[in-house]
């Protein structure tokens, strides 16, 4: 399944379209944030010139041709136009022949004509605090071309909305990686923002967005990503009103790939880790896990970071020098982070005598250097490690914990559920 959004927009034309006869004057109507501009073209009609003779053969039937009369919304010269409102250009006679909408940087805004080309409507995705120019032409039923030109400015946002994303563009990741979008400012109108987010996949995938808080929204599938899937995330938030005068100032697209399926299961009670690659058992590894007082958490963990060498200092988990449990090892090899609080899977040659038989670590899963290197070379950021055998469970947000939430509860975290 491809998640996305369909947007419907109403049309409000506040301007007055006036078809003027030749020789009359015209004036523009200006209104901040709205209104419409009416641009009459030249019109043709039969002359009643004084002194001209009238004969029975002279036709009294009025001409059916007319010059194009144009209305642009927002009005020419308008300021503080809301970026999430569409721009419309309408003619009451003839048809529009070409319309272009550009900002002051030269970036075009896409739009479309209706069936008979009497109206053009832009996508409602303008930049806040920008100047825009509408240009083009229309052709009246009289065959005459009428030029179109109008300018306006959008309102200035007091706060912008920009996104940073996990994973990286072009990255190949594991089958359990949740898409994570971090906003630079809080989102009040989550539904409006979520409508602008979409995920496209090369194979059908059932997935959902889930708001972690007002500054983070994640996406994961119902089940692990199928191996080899190509994924494109479109963050189409330019011009979106996130609430509290916070407006999307840009959008971005992220494309990434899912690698092979590497699913690992750690059984703390049996002191083993099994690794299955594309569904087949690849290796069973003797391990040691957390001892009493440092129990390894059970739950679905996801590899977040990988280090060929990593310093591990117990001060990061609250232990101080002088404590009998304190350690500071400068060169732990083949370390892979699975929690924010400091649990890793890594090589632990100092505990080789306990691997496969006892739990002696401070919470990490340790193994031989040979097995740790092999495991490191198989995995990607985003691969799942499922830990069982303890009564201590994963806390929400202590790492990439999306898979510890039921699918029903996860979907309920969508602002559009």
Where are each of the predicted segments found?
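Structured segments of extracytoplasmic/periplasmic soluble domains
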Residues: 182, 186, 190, 276, ...
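Gly/Pro-biased beta-strand-loop elements
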Residues: 161, 245-353
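Short, glycine/acidic-rich beta->alpha junctions
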Residues: 217, 258, 265-268, 366-371
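Exported/periplasmic cell-wall-interacting domains
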Residues: 175, 298, 315-417
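Short, surface-exposed secondary-structure junctions/capping segments
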Residues: 39, 43, 55, 297-310, ...
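Acidic, low-complexity Ser/Thr/Gly/Pro-rich repeat segments typical of extracellular/periplasmic
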Residues: 2-260, 287
């Amino acid at each position: 399944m491809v998640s996305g959004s369909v947007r419907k927009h109403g049309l409000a034309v506040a301007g007055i379209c006036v078809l003027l006869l030749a020789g009359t004057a015209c004036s523009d109507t200006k209104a901040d944030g709205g209104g419409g501009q009416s641009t009459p073209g030249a019109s043709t009609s039969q002359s009643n010139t004084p002194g001209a003779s009238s004969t029975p053969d002279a036709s009294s039937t009025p001409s059916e041709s007319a010059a194009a009369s144009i209305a642009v919304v927002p009005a020419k010269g308008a300021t503080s136009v809301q970026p999430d409102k569409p721009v419309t250009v309408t003619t009451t006679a003839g048809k529009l022949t070409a319309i272009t909408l550009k900002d002051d940087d030269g970036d075009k805004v896409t739009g479309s004509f209706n069936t008979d080309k009497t109206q053009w409507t832009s996508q409602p995705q303008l930049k806040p605090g920008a100047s825009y120019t509408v240009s083009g032409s229309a052709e009246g039923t009289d065959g005459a071309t009428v030029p179109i030109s109008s300018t306006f400015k959008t309102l200035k946002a007091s706060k912008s909305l920009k996104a940073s994303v996990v994973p990286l563009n072009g990255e190949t990741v594991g089958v359990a990686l949740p898409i994570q979008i971090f906003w630079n400012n809080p989102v009040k109108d989550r539904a409006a923002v979520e409508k602008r987010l979409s995920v496209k996949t090369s194979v059908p995938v059932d997935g959902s967005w889930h708001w972690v808080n007002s500054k983070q929204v994640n996406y994961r599938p119902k089940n692990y990503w199928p191996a080899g899937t190509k994924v494109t995330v479109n963050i189409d938030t330019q011009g979106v009103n996130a609430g509290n005068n916070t407006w999307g100032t840009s959008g971005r697209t992220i494309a990434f790939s899912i690698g092979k399926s590497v699913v690992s299961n750690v059984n703390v009670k049996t002191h083993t880790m099994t690794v299955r690659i594309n569904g087949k058992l690849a290796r069973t590894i003797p391990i040691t896990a957390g001892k009493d007082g440092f129990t390894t958490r059970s739950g679905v963990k996801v590899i977040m970071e990988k280090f060929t060498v990593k310093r591990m200092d117990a001060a990061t988990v609250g232990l101080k020098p002088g404590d009998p449990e304190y350690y500071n090892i400068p060169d732990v090899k083949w370390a892979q982070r699975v929690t924010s609080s400091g649990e890793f899977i890594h090589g632990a040659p100092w505990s080789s005598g306990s691997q496969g038989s006892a739990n002696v670590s401070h919470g990490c899963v340790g193994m031989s250097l040979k097995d740790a290197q092999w495991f490191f070379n198989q995995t990607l950021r985003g691969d799942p490690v499922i830990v069982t055998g303890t009564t201590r469970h994963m806390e929400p947000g202590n790492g990439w914990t999306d898979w510890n939430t039921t699918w029903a509860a996860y979907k309920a975290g969508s602002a559009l559920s």
